[in-house]
């Protein structure tokens, strides 16, 4: 019943076969696979694999500190797949909670769990849930209620045959507000694992990120676990040697920013990039609306047009024009980050906002100060 060449596998080449199978099993599909109509498989880093394989059997509650671009959401998705397979859970028994609707939509499309925003989690009833994964926890807020206690109570309910998994993924270096998060103080985070190998960003972008992250830790303006983050940064590495590019331009004014973005988008499209490779990120929703009009005007002058859409219903087939906060946890090949001259808590969070924007770019980053 088997092809004849199956009999060619013997003791001499069995090890090579097992090695190849191991590599295949440790891969995950790239978020951007469909860009060229084929599937790319990225290999989990050793640390990502260890975090999944060892802690799955060791601890039910875990804090995962991940530097920007280290694949926290990837690990969260793989973790949910693993607990479903290992414990034979239904997707209704596994709950993923994040702050923003676009990231929720992205995870929902994977069809491996329930996915809700923090606000929906606080308002909803989740009696069937046994396991909870919190992602991007540094940007949660406690204004609508105590999300942490609710999640802890659900996963440690006396009605469960055994405690459920409760994993929290966070990155203090990407904190984008000054309000209480609802998390316990960092001194109460135990046990803790960390991800320090950057897999998302080109080396030029990684170098910029490293510089800004070191500034955040060296001159803290927010309540962050400084010593713990210092240790993470000492271990930070970039997983590849793709150079990419970064361009920082200041004092353009809004019209100048719109002209710059329109011209560069036109150039990228002529080079063969598609609209869905591009994200244009503004600080506030008000600026998203303003730049939509300005960009449309500049594109008409260049006699071309691209579809600009918001992140509704997951990753679209168009260029994204979105706020920085709503794009948290997502990525694009080319990112234009538009940074206003001033905003609320500018002094406290400017460096964090720059890290948030820069870490969304895979290959080409344009930081524009209007």
Protein language model features and the residues they cover:
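Accessory nucleic-acid engagement/destabilization modules that flank
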Residues: 1-23
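Generic structural signal of hydrophobic/aromatic residues within well-ordered alpha-helices
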Residues: 14-21, 28, 209, 295
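Conserved helicase motor core of SF1/SF2 NTP-dependent helicases
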Residues: 35-114, 118-370
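Non-catalytic propeptide/linker segments at domain boundaries
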Residues: 19, 23-40
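Exposed alpha-helical structural elements
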Residues: 13-16, 27, 50, 204
């Amino acid at each position: 019943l088997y092809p004849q060449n199956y009999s060619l596998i013997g003791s001499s080449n069995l090890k090579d076969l097992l090695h190849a199978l191991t590599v295949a099993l440790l891969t995950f599909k790239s978020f951007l696979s469909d860009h060229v109509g084929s599937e790319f498989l990225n290999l989990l880093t050793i640390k990502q694999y260890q975090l999944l394989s060892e802690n799955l059997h060791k601890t039910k509650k875990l804090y995962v500190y991940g530097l920007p671009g280290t694949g926290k959401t990837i690990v969260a998705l793989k973790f949910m797949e693993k607990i479903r397979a290992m414990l034979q859970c239904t997707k209704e028994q596994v709950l993923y909670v994040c702050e923003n609707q676009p990231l929720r939509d992205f995870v929902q499309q994977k069809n491996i769990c329930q996915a809700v925003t923090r606000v929906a989690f606080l308002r909803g009833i989740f009696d069937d849930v046994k396991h909870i994964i919190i992602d991007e926890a540094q940007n949660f807020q406690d204004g609508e209620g105590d999300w942490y206690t609710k999640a802890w109570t659900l996963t440690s309910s006396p009605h469960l045959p055994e405690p459920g998994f409760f994993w929290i993924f966070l990155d203090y270096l990407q904190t984008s507000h000054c309000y209480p998060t609802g998390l316990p103080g960092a001194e109460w985070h135990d046990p803790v694992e960390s991800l320090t190998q950057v897999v998302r960003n080109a080396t030029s972008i990684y170098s910029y990120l490293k510089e800004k992250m070191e500034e955040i830790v060296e001159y803290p303006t927010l309540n962050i676990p400084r010593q713990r983050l210092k240790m993470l940064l000492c271990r930070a590495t970039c997983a590849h040697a793709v150079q990419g590019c970064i361009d920082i331009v200041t004092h353009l004014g809004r019209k100048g920013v719109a002209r710059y973005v329109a011209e560069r988008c036109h150039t990228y499209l002529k080079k063969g990039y598609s609209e869905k490779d591009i994200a244009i990120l503004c600080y506030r929703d008000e600026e998203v609306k303003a730049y939509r009009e300005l960009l449309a005007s500049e594109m008409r002058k260049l006699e071309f047009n691209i579809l600009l859409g918001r992140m509704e219903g997951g990753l679209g087939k168009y260029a994204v024009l979105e706020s920085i906060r709503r794009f948290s946890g997502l990525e694009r090949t080319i990112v234009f980050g538009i940074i206003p001259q001033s905003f609320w808590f500018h002094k406290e969070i400017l460096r964090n906002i720059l890290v948030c924007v820069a870490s969304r770019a895979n290959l080409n980053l344009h930081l524009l100060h209007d």
